[in-house]
């Protein structure tokens, strides 16, 4: 004789199914609220990035001319970095998927350009699965890159000649608008860096060109 499941048993199973769905929905709602709130805040301006031109991982000239009229995000790294560079590059890599349908560019400047040749940077880019045409890795004269970091982006940098002999640089990612104005700094070592950076980037994208 078949037994009909009790109402309490069915209700318990339904509850077990609904709890994770409701929890997931709540988490997604909270994330959307957080991003929306961040997008409402004013995005400050911290000065203009000077004109520059270096060589990218493909051996091609790349600089201000290629970025004119575009929103872009910059960082300073080097491929043999034993410290924060892998995390910084990982954060930059995280930006690729949410920005894939935009024209926002990613630019990584090497602070060890003598070792980071275009070939070395190309290999590094491949390991990060950097999207061609979106994420460029730049090398060039050390003095010019350091001047751009210090005077242009207002970020400290040193070749380490007075310490352990390894380059020392900022862990911040920098948001630049279509007019070459610096609009935000985001420490890649902070868990919420990507969320805040994406919110501000989307805010700038919504502004008239």
Label each residue range with its predicted role.
Residues 1-51, 208-209:
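N-terminal targeting signals for export/organelle localization
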Residues 49-50, 72, 170-172:
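Short loop/turn microsegments at loop-to-beta-strand junctions
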Residues 53-54, 175:
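Hydrophobic beta-strand positions
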Residues 62-92:
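Short active-site neighborhood of thiol/selenol oxidoreductases, capturing the structured segment around
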Residues 89-148:
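Structural microenvironment flanking redox-active thiols in thiol-disulfide oxidoreductases
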Residues 135, 146, 153-159, 167-174:
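Structural micro-motif
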Residues 161-209:
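Thiol-/selenol-based redox modules, centered on thioredoxin-like
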């Amino acid at each position: 004789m078949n037994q009909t499941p009790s109402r309490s048993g069915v209700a318990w199973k339904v509850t077990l199914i609904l709890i994770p769905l409701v929890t997931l929905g709540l988490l997604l709602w909270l994330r959307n609220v957080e991003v929306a709130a961040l997008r409402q805040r004013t995005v400050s301006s911290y000065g203009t990035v000077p004109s520059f031109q270096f060589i990218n991982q493909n051996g091609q000239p790349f600089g201000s001319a290629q970025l004119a009229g575009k929103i872009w995000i910059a960082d300073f790294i080097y491929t043999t970095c034993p410290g924060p560079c892998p995390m910084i590059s990982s954060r930059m890599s995280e930006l690729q998927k949410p920005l894939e349908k935009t024209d926002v560019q990613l630019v990584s400047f090497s602070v060890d350009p003598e070792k980071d040749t275009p070939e070395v940077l190309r290999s590094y880019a491949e390991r990060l699965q950097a999207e061609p045409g979106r994420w460029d890795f730049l090398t060039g004269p050390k003095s010019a890159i350091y001047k751009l970091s210090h005077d242009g982006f207002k970020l400290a940098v040193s070749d380490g000649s007075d310490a352990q002999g390894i380059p020392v640089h900022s862990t911040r990612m920098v948001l630049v608008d279509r007019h070459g104005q610096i609009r935000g700094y985001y420490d890649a070592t902070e868990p919420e860096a990507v969320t805040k950076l994406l919110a501000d980037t989307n805010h700038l994208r919504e502004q008239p060109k």
